[in-house]
C-alpha cells in the first residue's frame, strides 16, 4: 500500500513543475488565462479624456467614498451601478466633471486591486514550486526507506503520512489558485460595466 502511495506521489511531483506556469514570459504566472499586467484605459473607457481628473479625484471625499463603495466586489454590480447613477443624478451637479473624477478613481482603485491579486497569485506559485520540490525529495526518501533492509517501519509511516499531508495542502492551494485566477477578469468586467454606467449619465 505504501509503495503504491509513493509511486502516486512521485508521479504527482514529477508533473507539478510542468503545470505551474503556462506563459514562459511570466514563469510565476499560474493561470490558463493570459497575463495582462495592467488594464488599458482604452479597453474600459470610451468617454472623454480624463485629464486632470486622474490626479484630482482624491481631493473630493464624496468621490473617494463612492469609489471605495462601488469598487468593492462584495457589493453586487447592479447596486454599484445604481449608486453611481444616483450620485450623478443629483440636482445641480456637473455630470461631466464629476463623472470623469469618479471613473478616474475607479480605474486607479480597481487597477491596484487587480495588481495585488496578480502579485498574490505569483507568490503562491513560488510557494507551490517549493512545495513541489519538497514532495519530490520526500517521495524519493520514502522509496529509499522502503528499499532498506530491514525497513524502518515507524519512519516509513511517519514520512508517508507527512507526504499525504503535504500533497493535500498542495492540491488545496491549486484549487484555490484556479478560483482566484478568475478574479482579474472579474475586475476588468466590473470596471468596464461601471464605466459604461458613468458614460450613459454624462453623454
List where the protein language model places each region.
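Positively charged n-region of N-terminal signal peptides that target proteins for export
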Residues: 1-5
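Bacterial N-terminal signal peptides
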Residues: 6-15
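N-terminal Sec/ER secretory leader and immediately downstream segment
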Residues: 21-96
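Short, charge-rich amphipathic alpha-helices with coiled-coil/heptad character
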Residues: 89-118
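Non-transmembrane amphipathic alpha-helical segments
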Residues: 117, 124, 128-146
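Short E/K-rich amphipathic alpha-helical oligomerization segments
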Residues: 137-165
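Alpha-helical oligomerization segments
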Residues: 154-203
